[in-house]
Design a protein with these regions (language model features):
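Glycine- and aromatic-enriched membrane alpha-helices
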Residues: 1-356
């Protein structure tokens, strides 16, 4: 039964995983859509190869061949972190940049963080909790978007207006897939599956309503879709550890804060999916909700608010450090490899020209 449950979660997440690149690619000019989708596909392929050849084993200390299904489920978590920062990476306008960066980022940032929190690493032993990726997936993605935006700021294009139908459809696919995203770490539907589903819906409703009220400068469809995405992101850190009342308050707070940040900084960052504001806000507010409102029956025995606050804040600090340093190193290495490739290619072209 556990294998069938994991398979169902894996299949449900597939449309969600590919809807984010679709939304990001369509925010650029129509002439760039095909290229952007191709770049996204290359990046997903490169990161998947890195995960299968060593990333999973390093993160979870298990061989890929021993039990392939968890490898694929965890791969989707890693890839979702990557596609959320895709919109920023597309601004580099170099086809080989994102595939190189994706593979390096997965090994230098995602794998160490996943090991520390989900692979029985030091932060997990310290008592830090992260149910379905508030820190592992969303905080790493949001902070990496910050690194990329700062590096690529002068190259960022003017984004095209969002199409309400495209945005709504993409959001529906993400919402549907998120049930698999939040349920997969539970391992089975019972006993906590119904609560996880309820908390996911509550987070979406409260964050969506908060966005609708707090961001009057945006179209209503955009506000609701952004609110849904914020609620989904916020739910991940605590969805299996709290009751619906705590989730409602957490979703409301996250929606209000994220709406203000996007309203104020969207034109500054020019990120098609507002990864920095939504992911970082959702992750940090989710951690705060977990510390203040966890249900003692849903967390490890003996957990106290003070102890959890210490372990969670330590985890946040460690994840921030690993992400900022690892992302910058991955960026430098990607740029260096591209520069070397261009020089070698230029030499080869000159040699062929002389021979002709």
């Amino acid at each position: 039964m556990q294998a069938q449950f994991q398979l169902l979660c894996f299949l449900v997440m597939i449309p969600m995983l590919f809807s984010v690149p679709w939304l990001a690619a369509n925010r650029f000019s129509p002439q760039q859509v095909a290229r952007n989708l191709a770049v996204a596909g290359l990046g997903i392929a490169a990161a998947s190869v890195a995960w299968l050849l060593g990333g999973y084993s390093l993160a979870f200390h298990q061989e890929v061949i021993s039990d392939p299904l968890p490898v694929l489920v965890q791969l989707e978590f890693a890839l979702y972190a990557l596609v959320m920062l895709l919109g920023t990476a597309l601004a580099a306008r170099r086809t080989l940049f994102f595939p190189l960066f994706a593979a390096l980022w997965l090994l230098l940032v995602y794998v160490p963080v996943a090991n520390l929190l989900w692979g029985n690493g030091w932060l997990a032993k310290l008592g830090a909790l992260d149910f379905s990726g508030g820190l592992v997936v969303h905080l790493t993605a949001g902070l990496t978007s910050l690194v990329l935006v700062r590096h690529l700021r002068v190259q960022l294009p003017i984004l095209t207006a969002e199409q309400p139908g495209t945005t709504a459809l993409g959001t529906v696919l993400i919402f549907t897939g998120w049930f698999g995203f939040n349920l997969a770490p539970a391992g089975s539907f019972l006993p906590h599956g119904p609560l996880i589903m309820l908390n996911t819906v509550v987070a979406v409703l409260t964050a969506g309503l908060a966005w609708a009220v707090a961001a009057p400068g945006q179209e209503l469809v955009d506000r609701l879709c952004n609110g849904i995405n914020t609620g989904l992101v916020t739910s991940t850190a605590l969805v299996g550890f709290v009751g619906p009342q705590t989730m409602a308050v957490t979703g409301l707070v996250a929606g209000l804060i994220a709406a203000q940040l996007v309203e104020r900084y969207h034109q500054v960052w020019q990120d098609p999916v507002d990864s920095l504001q939504i992911n970082t806000t959702g992750a940090l507010v989710g951690v705060g909700g977990l510390i203040l409102g966890f249900d003692p029956h849903l967390v490890p025995a003996g957990t106290t608010h003070l102890a959890l606050a210490g372990s969670e804040l330590t985890a946040v600090g460690v994840v921030v450090l690993i992400t900022l340093v690892g992302s910058q190193v991955a960026l430098w290495l990607s740029e260096g490899c591209l520069h070397a490739y261009q020089r070698i290619r230029g030499v080869n072209i000159n040699v062929r020209s002389e021979e002709n």
